[in-house]
Amino acid sequence: MLTKRIIPCLDVKDGKTVKGVNFLNLRDAGDPVELGALYSQQGADELVFLDITATLEKRGTLVELVKRVAQHINIPFTIGGGIGSIEDVSACLNAGADKVSVNSSAIKNPALIDQLSKEFGNQCIVVAIDTRNVGGMNLVHSHGGTKPTDLDTIAWAKEMQERGAGELLLTSMDKDGTKAGFANELTAYISTHVSIPIIASGGAGTMEHFTDVFTLGKADAALAASIFHFKEIAIPELKSYLSGKGIHMRK
C-alpha cells in the first residue's frame, strides 16, 4: 500500500516567504530555503514552492530559488509559478527541482502538458487545479484563482491525466484559508475518476482534517501552509497521529 504524503507549501514573493512566518529560531523568518530545510528535518515528505512574484524576470527568479533550495534540501520539491514553456521547465529541472507545477499555462494551452510529459516524463509534471463552486458547478479558475473559466473540474482533471500529467494538485478555493477541513467529497470524486495521485490543498486546520482527507477524500497527499508556518501543527506529531489512525505514513 502506498504511503500518504504530507507537503508543506511555501508561497514566495520577491525571495521571501509570504503568509507571515513566525519561526523564532530562524535567522531570517522569511527565508523560504531555511524554512524548507526545517520542514525537511521535521519529516515533511515533499515541499512545494510557489513563486508568486509578478515580474518580467520570472524564470530568472524561479531558477535562483530552485538552485538555493536544491543546495540545502534533500527531500523532493516542486516549483511552480508562471511556468509556461519547455524552456521554463528545463531550466527549473536542471537547477535541481524534482517536479514543476503548471496551472494557468495549461488552461491557456492544454497541449503544453502533452509536450512537457513527452519531453521530460510525466513523473515530474504536476498540474495545479484551482477550483471553486459557482452556481452548483465546480469550475476551474486561472491566474492564481482570480479568473473563473467555464471548465468543469472533473472533466479538466481527466483531460490533464490523458495529456500526461503525473499528479494533480487540487486546491479548493471555497475551503482555502477556512481551516474548516478539506473538500473531501470533491477530492474523493476526482480521485475515483483518475488513476494519478491527487494532492489535496485548502482547508487544513486540525490533525483530524488530515485523517479525513486521506480516508474520506481518498487523497494521496495533503498540502498545507499556514498551520505549519504558524506552528499550529507540528509535522512529527501529525505523522505519528495519522499512523495511530491506521494511515500509512512515510517514516
From Swiss-Prot:
Primary location class: cytoplasm
GO CC annotations, alphabetized: cytoplasm
One Pfam family matching this protein: His_biosynth
GO biological processes: L-histidine biosynthetic process
Catalytic activity, EC: 4.3.2.10
Active-site feature positions: 11, 130
GO molecular function: imidazoleglycerol-phosphate synthase activity; lyase activity
InterPro entries per record: Aldolase_TIM (IPR013785), His_biosynth (IPR006062), HisF (IPR004651), IGPS_HisA/HisF (IPR050064), RibuloseP-bd_barrel (IPR011060)
Biological pathway: Amino-acid biosynthesis; L-histidine biosynthesis; L-histidine from 5-phospho-alpha-D-ribose 1-diphosphate: step 5/9
UniProtKB keywords: Amino-acid biosynthesis, Cytoplasm, Histidine biosynthesis, Lyase
Enzyme class, broadest EC rank: lyase
CDD domains: HisF
Enzymatic reactions: 5-[(5-phospho-1-deoxy-D-ribulos-1-ylimino)methylamino]-1-(5-phospho-beta-D-ribosyl)imidazole-4-carboxamide + L-glutamine = D-erythro-1-(imidazol-4-yl)glycerol 3-phosphate + 5-amino-1-(5-phospho-beta-D-ribosyl)imidazole-4-carboxamide + L-glutamate + H(+)
The keyword Nucleus appears for this protein: no
Localization in the cell: Cytoplasm
Biological role stated in the UniProt entry: IGPS catalyzes the conversion of PRFAR and glutamine to IGP, AICAR and glutamate. The HisF subunit catalyzes the cyclization activity that produces IGP and AICAR from PRFAR using the ammonia provided by the HisH subunit.
UniProt subunit comment: Heterodimer of HisH and HisF.
Record-linked PANTHER family: IMIDAZOLE GLYCEROL PHOSPHATE SYNTHASE HISHF, IMIDAZOLE GLYCEROL PHOSPHATE SYNTHASE SUBUNIT HISF/H IGP SYNTHASE SUBUNIT HISF/H
Family, similarity comment: Belongs to the HisA/HisF family.
The protein's name in its UniProt record: Imidazole glycerol phosphate synthase subunit HisF
Source organism: Cytophaga hutchinsonii (strain ATCC 33406 / DSM 1761 / CIP 103989 / NBRC 15051 / NCIMB 9469 / D465)
Organism lineage string: Bacteria, Pseudomonadati, Bacteroidota, Cytophagia, Cytophagales
